[in-house]
A protein has these predicted regions:
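Active-site beta3 strand of CheY-like receiver
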Residues: 50-56
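Non-catalytic signal-transmission and effector/linker regions of two-component phosphorelay proteins
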Residues: 1-9, 113-125
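Acidic catalytic/metal-coordinating carboxylates
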Residues: 38-42, 65-68
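The feature encodes the CheY-like receiver
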Residues: 20, 62
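Short amphipathic alpha-helix used as the core "switch/output" element in two-component signaling
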Residues: 45, 67-78
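Hydrophobic/aromatic residues positioned on beta-strands within the core alpha/beta folds
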Residues: 85-87
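Charged docking surfaces used in two-component/phosphorelay signaling
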Residues: 21-29
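Short hydrophobic/Thr-rich beta-strand motif most characteristic of the beta2 strand and flanking loop
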Residues: 31-38, 46, 108
Length: 125
């Protein structure tokens, strides 16, 4: 069995490439198998084949916001754990909309400290 098959898979989505790449690198060095994508649409496209255990996504992205991407990915992968992060105030309205639809996503504020992120991820394993 390949070594990566036992590592939790994490899909990281952020339209700021440096953030997505940095988070994926930190996660890969911390015992996860992480892939970075740069849009909500790409996350939705990759999720069925990558089969992540967890999604970490920015909320505010141009093509498909992180909450809508999370809802659509959860429909494909019902057991996926979802952690959202944002540095923008507009997030509250989007979260309220998701809560009204029965989704209870956890959110971290940007900038995300790597230790805070790892603690959250290890808590959902």
């Amino acid at each position: 069995m390949p070594e990566n098959s036992t590592k939790p898979k994490v899909l990281v989505a952020d339209d700021e490439r440096v953030i997505a790449d940095t988070l994926a690198m930190i996660l890969n060095q911390s015992g996860f198998q992480a892939r970075a994508v740069y849009s909500g649409e790409k996350a939705l496209e990759l999720a069925p084949t990558f089969q992540p255990d967890m999604l970490i996504s920015d909320v505010i992205m141009a093509d498909l916001n992180g909450i809508d991407a999370a809802i659509r990915i959860r429909a494909l992968l019902p057991s996926i754990k979802i952690l959202l992060f944002s540095g923008q105030a507009a997030t509250a309205d989007l979260l309220e909309k998701a809560h009204a639809q029965g989704y209870d996503f956890e959110i971290l504020a940007k900038p995300v400290h790597p230790q805070d992120l790892l603690s959250k991820l290890r808590g959902v394993n």
